[in-house]
Amino acid sequence: MAFFSRLNLQEGLQTFFVLQWIPVYIFLGAIPILLIPYFLLFSKFWPLAVLSLAWLTYDWNTHSQGGRRSAWVRNWTLWKYFRNYFPVKLVKTHDLSPKHNYIIANHPHGILSFGVFINFATEATGIARIFPSITPFVGTLERIFWIPIVREYVMSMGVCPVSSSALKYLLTQKGSGNAVVIVVGGAAEALLCRPGASTLFLKQRKGFVKMALQTGAYLVPSYSFGENEVFNQETFPEGTWLRLFQKTFQDTFKKILGLNFCTFHGRGFTRGSWGFLPFNRPITTVVGEPLPIPRIKRPNQKTVDKYHALYISALRKLFDQHKVEYGLPETQELTIT
């Protein structure tokens, strides 16, 4: 009985720490968005709002210059419960020399990119031990850093904007041994994810290759096997009113917020139930062999296309070498759109 009690407690903690992830960001984001205008206009606490905005203005460039990472935050115990929920694993195939900088391109995006977050924005899977002397940064939308409190939280985990200025700073002005992790397919790729799928939005995604050429950063392919398995995405049949409504809503959502809206679901609080918790399915992020890239200040399109093709070839090789080991059939092919 004691064993089952401990087991249930572990599962409960894992579920809680996964469940809190998105609400925490929403809550932290809502506090300044709602309270700052209220304090400014209607409250005697208006000096707090003024100080918050003054600090944001004073500290505006920090997130584009490496941020303020915290080893303490990255090592929080809650991330280990988060890791064990799926579980999430990081696999190294080749060493990364601290003499170089790297762009680690990750695929697929999935719905929420759990693999990238746990493996590179925390120490839950031991990235500092697996890749010693390498400092990882995870790229995300710059608008997140416009929100007080939230920006401090994500910066503490080594998250940075995926903007040109921020990436160039990390890859050219912060020494060597830096690795910027970018989920290249972005939100457009999230619309392609579903269990059993291995479809990437990559043919027209060449900005990361151009950035590698401009900075001389080595390109590293990585693939998170299982990322597409943790949620079911619903796409209604073409020609139905549900599909028309879904597509209209998604197009409007993207125009207003610049984001793609996915209709998805996972499990509930009990196994077998319906809800918005991800399914307990393993996610394994395999990091491949670095592809040396020459530094060219103004690469032409032909050069960008050349190294983009080399990158895709290396990614396909990585996928084919590991797909069976991590749950995909031998016949599964990587589809690139």
From Swiss-Prot:
CDD domains: LPLAT_MGAT-like
Keywords: Acyltransferase, Endoplasmic reticulum, Lipid biosynthesis, Lipid metabolism, Membrane, Transferase, Transmembrane, Transmembrane helix
Primary gene name: DGAT2L6
Record membrane topology: Multi-pass membrane protein
PANTHER family reported in the protein's UniProt record: DIACYLGLYCEROL O-ACYLTRANSFERASE, DIACYLGLYCEROL O-ACYLTRANSFERASE 2-LIKE PROTEIN 6
Tissue: Expressed in all tissues tested except pancreas.
Organism this protein belongs to: Homo sapiens
Function (record text): Diglyceride acyltransferase that uses fatty acyl-CoA as substrate. Particularly active with oleate as a substrate. Has no wax synthase activity to produce wax esters. Able to use 1-monoalkylglycerol (1-MAkG) as an acyl acceptor for the synthesis of monoalkyl-monoacylglycerol (MAMAG).
One annotated GO biological process: lipid metabolic process
MF GO annotations: diacylglycerol O-acyltransferase activity; O-acyltransferase activity
Disulfide feature: none
GO cellular component, one term: endoplasmic reticulum membrane
Enzyme nomenclature, EC number: 2.3.1.-
Protein name (Swiss-Prot/TrEMBL): Diacylglycerol O-acyltransferase 2-like protein 6
Subcellular location: Endoplasmic reticulum membrane
